[in-house]
Amino acid sequence: IKYIIKERTEKIVLPKTLGFGQIFTDHIFEMDYTKGKGWHNPTIKPLENLQIHPAMSVIHYGQSIFEGLKAFKTINDEIVIFRPDVHIQRLNNSARRICMPEVDVDFALEALKELVAIDSDWIPANRGEALYIRPFMFGTDPALGVRPSFDYKLVFLLSPVAAYYPEGFKPVKILIQDDYVRAVRKGLGECKTSANYAASLLAAQEASKKGFTQVLWLDGVEQKYLEEVGTMNIFVQFKDEIATPKLSGSILPGVTRRSVIQILKEWGMNVTERAISIDEVISAYDKGNL
């Protein structure tokens, strides 16, 4: 890894209100891919604007994927990152689905940890705050034509953040969405592609106008079974069971989802992955079993 470090002369002072994704650290990690050469030129360098060609393939054909994870400081001032290996593996899963090159997991983890260590002074210390890590990859070919790009760029971007929603860690209101479909099986639903989020914007905007924070998506065929919320998976606690929709090819396999299932099982709780109809949820609510 090549290092170009920006020497900071003043102390970092974070604002009292961080928001989400509005503030960025001093450095980024970049690495390029070209056909025939593979991944090369890994560099940690000062944050700067990306240069793009008007014909860059990602602008026209949407070949873009990303991840989102967090780094924290413990009470002993140690830096911990939440399951970064699983996130990089999921990035590779998304890459395969839309014909993008995979990255070496061990090397990507090394680069990620190095970047976080260099900008560790940006990690907030307050409860509920963290350093958000956004790995993303996109096609960079300066050419028109519907095909996989020959060239790509991988970037790691860091941002000190508070809670994602304005409500903080309080419960949020979600609107059951049956006018639009987020994804269908054998589509892109199980991948973290930019296209999935673009497709969700109109529904989220309409929900916001009605006073809701997010959308609860139903399956794309029958519009009957729970799938996920706009930015997260969902669990439903019934009287004697905690259930979450099973992964069917249209649901993002969340890292937090996977962790919650593992913890609940270790606690000896009855957790299941299965089809959950919205009618079942409403019925359980009416009977006082939700």
Feature names for model-found ranges:
Residues 105-107, 115-128:
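Charged, gly/pro-rich active-site loop segments
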Residues 124-134, 138:
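Extended, Lys/Arg-enriched charged tracts that mediate electrostatic binding to polyanionic substrates
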